[in-house]
Amino acid sequence: MAHIHPTALVDPAARVAADAMVGAYSIIGAGVEIGEGTIIGPHVVVTGRTAIGKRNRIFQFASIGDIPQDRKYGGEPTTTTIGDDNVFREYVSIHAGTAQDRGDTKIGNGNLFLAYTHVAHDCVVGNFTTFSNNAQIAGHVRIDDWVVMGAYSGVHQFGRVGVHAMVGTFAAVLGDVPPFTTVSGFPAKPHGTNNEGLRRRGFTSDQILEVRRAYKALYRENLTLEDARAKIAAAAVNAPVLAPLVEFLAVPGRGIVR
């Protein structure tokens, strides 16, 4: 039987794993599913059609799965899906999707959301990302694996941030951030590649060199985007580390940050 504090309000229709924990004064709604080993602290609200996987930890005053902050939302049965091994610190808010897009807000595995961070409706967050304090992403944003969002940074709706990118503190991201890129400023502009992050994750010197060459083609050689994409795609034939960048640039979005 789940470890539920006597003051917690858990709807009988909620599905809570036998070894999950729900802290004092927390509220768990009828459509919620909580996986094995997940720990929900005191004063947490989990509501809506929300599925939370295994071994997550949710700290006090977080709000997970509530309706989106979107004028178009009309009460549709949209969802929030959270994977395994995530940490949500104090006052984190994660909102459900909308019928106008995916209908689901999705968070992968192994992510760390520090205090006061926000994930809006229909966002897709990958794996092993870090959202520093007060980082916020608007609706329909995609954050790929291993991204680091600096404190007080934000991403405009429909924006994309590619794998291993780093968004600096206070940065306002109005476009798409290519994989491996570091951006900062208001509005955010590119400032090289995330070399230190790549080293920490086991990339070799040769792989990092290929990433830097691709960045140079994209931003430093005065090439059109089409020509830069072609050059990077050609390099990727012998440098598979560039495959995520090739795939990212092939998808039309808000346009890459400049």
Task: Describe every region a protein language model picked out.
Residues H3-K189:
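Structural signal for interior beta-strand "rungs" in well-ordered beta-sheet cores
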Residues M1-T7, P12-A13, A18-D19, R55, ...:
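Terminal amphipathic alpha-helical/low-complexity segments used for targeting or macromolecular assembly
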